């Protein structure tokens, strides 16, 4: 029988529900259980694919092509699993599906209501996420906070699950903020008490509290919370601020969180062996070197827009025994005149993805600087496309070369719209999304990075591609197409082999990086940056 764990939040948003859920998932996985995890987002968008990065952060893409919340990146990195489209559910997605069924007459003339139709659809998504992955345990995080009007159908569905599958198969975990008032010199439990009161008013009694705090919590405070919130004192778990996120699973295990969960759900499984994870954390906490990477982007005011890129760089840093120091460079501010000032101290340059014209000329200048000064450079998605544009302009003499996306009237459309995208009008959910194969060129930098594999599978999110009309011109000038689709139609990786490291990929390698298993192309880039730093000393 599948076990269901529901994680809700109270008092304030952004208190780390996703990290708590992911950490618990890692602990349960290390007990030998097959775990999956999903995120409920109560916004009305179908998915975050068309949302501004300034509002939502990055869009995380799954193997099967779902555009999802960035928390799924945390889930995959912590638990080391590949999630699917059932792992992110929004209000918009649920209402869209219910209304589509209503139009088809599938409700046989019934009045369509929040209860039972919306709540039934939500419960079906929970169960589908578990069955499609054949999981022993599914953890469902509900975005937002208890008391938000848009969360009510989600919480009602969670309440109903207890009756549907039995109380011994359901556990409710409530995460809240425990504020510390410096003036009074004490922690305040009242916000948590009111949050739990609100949750109980909706028919959900939490079985565990996870309290986010900056200071250590005395047992007396935990006892008070247990008494007023009707949970066992040992089920009041402290989630204190840490230096590194990957410490959190170990901190939760030290408080027997996973054992309490297993006892409640009647799971008789071995203790979690966190030896490898602990060794990884020790390595992270004791890095001996620092490597400086310039990240040139258009959304740098909100680092969450590049969350997976940053994490992948860190993972590859761990493998090289180096911390990554990021210089956040706003592409809008970068010009040929100030490129040396902004980029001259970097050991490596990364140009990540994006959409639209703003900032593209600055990114092109960053790529040009990397090429002309032989600074290790990694381009991702739009960064790969602009790598091709830069080469066309400044090496091949195609002065007005551009992407069709950025200039439909360009005489040299180095990057063109994909053929199967030409007649598509909708923006949402219509990109080339998900896992696709990439055939590697033997002897190339890319092939070496991937241990000379012939084919790798990586996740994509794009609508434009390299225009093959220009392929011979590029190759004649020494530009290498080191990764292509198996049918040789789509360019996936480009490089200049004579440089220290000058590689760009159409796909998003960062989406498959893990703290204990860094993505190979990122690792090759960071390794080159470390070597470049050493040569400059």
Curated annotation (Swiss-Prot):
Extra remark: CTPSs have evolved a hybrid strategy for distinguishing between UTP and CTP. The overlapping regions of the product feedback inhibitory and substrate sites recognize a common feature in both compounds, the triphosphate moiety. To differentiate isosteric substrate and product pyrimidine rings, an additional pocket far from the expected kinase/ligase catalytic site, specifically recognizes the cytosine and ribose portions of the product inhibitor.
Keywords: ATP-binding, Glutamine amidotransferase, Ligase, Magnesium, Metal-binding, Nucleotide-binding, Pyrimidine biosynthesis
Single Gene Ontology BP annotation: pyrimidine nucleobase biosynthetic process
Coiled-coil region list: none
Residues involved in UTP binding: 13, 188-193, 224
Residues the entry annotates as binding ATP: 14-19, 71, 240-242
Protein name per Swiss-Prot or TrEMBL: CTP synthase
Domain Glutamine amidotransferase type-1 intervals: 292-535
Root EC class: ligase
Entry annotation: catalytic residues: 381, 508, 510
Domain of life: Bacteria
Function: Catalyzes the ATP-dependent amination of UTP to CTP with either L-glutamine or ammonia as the source of nitrogen. Regulates intracellular CTP levels through interactions with the four ribonucleotide triphosphates.
The EC number(s) this enzyme carries: 6.3.4.2
Binding-site residues for L-glutamine, renumbered to this chain: 54, 354, 382-385, 405, 463
SUPFAM superfamilies recorded: Class I glutamine amidotransferase-like (SSF52317), P-loop containing nucleoside triphosphate hydrolases (SSF52540)
GO molecular function, one term: identical protein binding
PROSITE patterns named among the record's database cross-references: GATASE_TYPE_1
Amidoligase domain: region residues: 1-267
The reaction(s) this protein catalyses: UTP + L-glutamine + ATP + H2O = CTP + L-glutamate + ADP + phosphate + 2 H(+); L-glutamine + H2O = L-glutamate + NH4(+); UTP + NH4(+) + ATP = CTP + ADP + phosphate + 2 H(+)
Subunit structure: Homotetramer.
One annotated Gene Ontology cellular component of this protein: cytosol
